[in-house]
């Protein structure tokens, strides 16, 4: 599989997990920068995707070339994965969606 790109929606195998993390084969949005993808050539940073609307303001609706049904990026669950967990391509979010996702991640990191 080619290198992931920022905003790409990929299929990942997330087992084993702990607590409230999603398990199994799931879609995730790549949030790594191009520089991180280039430097950390065996890793990728992602946020998982859900089709359940919980009404949480930090869950970002995916816009772009993605799924036939509404889906949301779960920005509170940023995870760095081995690229060996990537098992396929699912689509691409638009630039505005990726910016919204990254803004939420930055908000979680700011003091």
Question: Which residue ranges define each predicted feature?
Answer:
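Conserved functional hotspots at enzyme active or ligand-binding sites that engage polyanionic ligands
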Residues: 1-111
